[in-house]
Amino acid sequence: RVIDLAGAYLMPGLINMHVHFCGSGKPVSAGDAGSLMKKLDNPVGRAIVRHILKGSAQQQLASGVTTVRGAGDPLLGDIAVRDAIDAGRAVGPRIVAPGTGITVPGGHGAGLFAQIATTPEEAAAQVRDLFAHRADVIKLFVTGGVFDAEKVGEPGVLRMSYDVAAAACAQAHQLGLPVMAHVESSEG
C-alpha cells in the first residue's frame, strides 16, 4: 500500500520520560492536597482520578507521544489507566507506570502523588506493595520540588535520607524493578 505524503511530515512516535498524568501543566500549589487525596480514596474518588488520568494519557497520544514513563500519580491511577489501555478498554500511549511515588514527611508530593516513608523498613514495604500492584518502576522523591517550595532555591533541598533511599532501591532491585528519582540538586 502506498500513501501519498506529499506536503506532509512523518515522524516516529515520541517518548515522554516524565509525566504526572494528574498535572495540567498549569502552576499549582500543593496546599492541602494530601487531605484531598484522603477524601478521594474511595470507589467514586478513584473513578474520578482514573477518568482525569485517562484524559491526560489520551492527550499525550494525540500530541504524538506513543510511550510515557509516569513519574507518580495519586491512588495508583496510572497503573489502572495502563491496564485499561493494555486491555483495549481505553486508548492511550504505552505507559511505564510507577504508581504512587515514595517520599518522606514534608517531602515533594507527600500525600498527593507520593506515599510517605518514615523509616527504611517502611520504604522497603512500600516498594513491595507497589510491586504487588504491578508497578513497572519505583519513583523516589529525594529532594524538594518546585510546587512545594516555600522560598526561592528550596526545591533542591535534600529531603530523603540515604538510608531510606538505599532501602527502597535495594528492595526494588531485589524484585527486578528499576528505580527513578526526583532530584533537583547535586546534594540529592
Model-derived regions, located:
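Metal-associated gating/positioning segment near the N- to mid-region
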Residues: 9-84, 108
